[in-house]
Design a protein with these regions (language model features):
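Nucleic-acid endo/exonuclease domains
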Residues: 1-99, 103-157
Length: 157
């Protein structure tokens, strides 16, 4: 397991290259945030985790090794728990969290996944400015719209 890369994996590079080509600027592997998200877009308040299907237990694609099965079940269960804890901590800090699975970046569905990431970023950014503001009526009395004394004269032609 010491040879397993934790940074700059192929799925991460695919997402980062797409975001950069579309004009998004980001930080990678930000250690100051819970869970050290793979990609952080501070302007959009979005943290993106890119998970491998095996290591993080993505159900449709999870195949445990036949040897030492109990160890792998516990390890992957703990990874899932830790992922959920980190996501919840980020949400409490005001971050929107996205999880992109390795299988979502396969060539047949990559385009849809990348467009979905971009949609989420834009939607999240716009929602920062759409916060409802309470109406405050600070004026007392009814405001006057028309002139106070207007004399209308009949015009003759």
């Amino acid at each position: 397991m010491a040879r397993i890369k934790g940074k700059d994996t192929k799925p991460e590079l695919i997402v980062r290259q797409y975001l950069y080509s579309r004009g998004y600027r980001y930080r990678k592997n930000v250690r100051t945030l819970p869970g050290t998200p793979d990609i952080v877009l501070k302007k959009y308040r979005v943290a993106i985790f890119i998970h491998g299907c095996f290591w993080h237990g993505h159900e449709p694609h999870l195949r445990l090794p036949k040897s030492n099965r109990e160890y792998w079940e516990q390890k992957i269960a703990r990874n899932r728990e830790r992922d959920e804890e980190n996501k919840e901590r980020l949400r409490r800090l005001g971050w929107s969290v996205m999880t992109v699975w390795e299988c979502q970046l396969r060539p047949e569905c990559r385009r849809d996944t990348l467009l979905e990431i971009e949609y989420h970023l834009n939607h999240n950014y716009l929602n920062q400015f759409r916060q409802p503001r309470p109406y405050n009526d600070t004026e007392t009395g009814t405001p006057q719209v028309a002139e106070s004394n207007t004399q209308y004269q009949k015009t003759t032609e």
